[in-house]
Amino acid sequence: MKMIIAVTFLGIVTIAFAEECRLMQPAANFDAATYFSIPHVYVTHSKNEPKTDVCREYDTSKTDGGSTTVITSNYKIKGQAVNNKVTCTSTGLKNGQTGQFSVVCQPPTGAAVTLTTSVLATDNQNYAILQRCPTSGQGNILVLQTAKEGVNPGVKDFFQKKGWNIDSWFSRTNVNCENIQS
């Protein structure tokens, strides 16, 4: 009986830790000054749920202490329009690591959310692959591009090197933001 309890406990602990998000290595070519000058991007692909992530746009502006990003969501779920804005403020580099930083996001209602992020790949102009991790639970990886349609060759190269299949991710192509079915 003790063995069954021990194995069950170990299984629960393993599952709990498997769901924890761990930041991946950031892009070596990350340049904060240039990266945070990209004014407007679309989330074109999302690895995990919620699929509504691909219906978002990011508008970033520099501030004295870092940057502020306004994330705008525009989509319809079963005919019901959802339009909201979340303001995220960069609170600095994570452990001094270039390409990794902490952000505090304030949704329209409710408490602020703190995330740690890692820019996995970028050309600092047209695209970025951004990993975001909440303080607990599973994170997500997003493809951000200045072009609403298509896939930048740099994104394709990164996915190929990682052995990832972009066609298996949620995208603006396979998620209809005007009529999302739950």
From Swiss-Prot:
CDD domains membership: lipocalin_LTBP1-like
Pfam entry (one): Triabin
Tissues expressing the protein: Expressed in salivary glands.
GO molecular function: toxin activity
A Gene Ontology BP annotation from the UniProt entry: symbiont-mediated perturbation of host defenses
UniProt-listed InterPro entries: Calycin, Triabi/Procalin
GO cellular component entries: extracellular region
Superkingdom, taxonomy of origin: Eukaryota
UniProt signal peptide: 1-18
Keyword annotations of the record: Disulfide bond, Hemostasis impairing toxin, Platelet aggregation inhibiting toxin, Secreted, Signal, Toxin
Location of the protein in the cell: Secreted
Cysteine disulfide partners in this protein: 21-133, 55-177, 88-105
Similarity comment text for this entry: Belongs to the calycin superfamily. Triabin family.
Chain's role: Inhibits platelet aggregation and vasoconstriction through binding to distinct eicosanoids involved in inflammation (acts as a scavenger), and has a role in inhibiting host innate immunity by impairing platelet-assisted formation of neutrophil extracellular traps (NETs). Inhibits platelet aggregation by collagen, and low doses of thromboxane A2 mimetic (TXA2 mimetic), and arachidonic acid (AA) without affecting aggregation induced by ADP, convulxin (GP6 agonist), and PMA. Binds to TXA2, TXB2, prostaglandine H2 mimetic (PGH2 mimetic), PGJ2, and PGF2alpha.
Name this protein carries in UniProt: Triplatin
Organism: Triatoma infestans (Assassin bug)
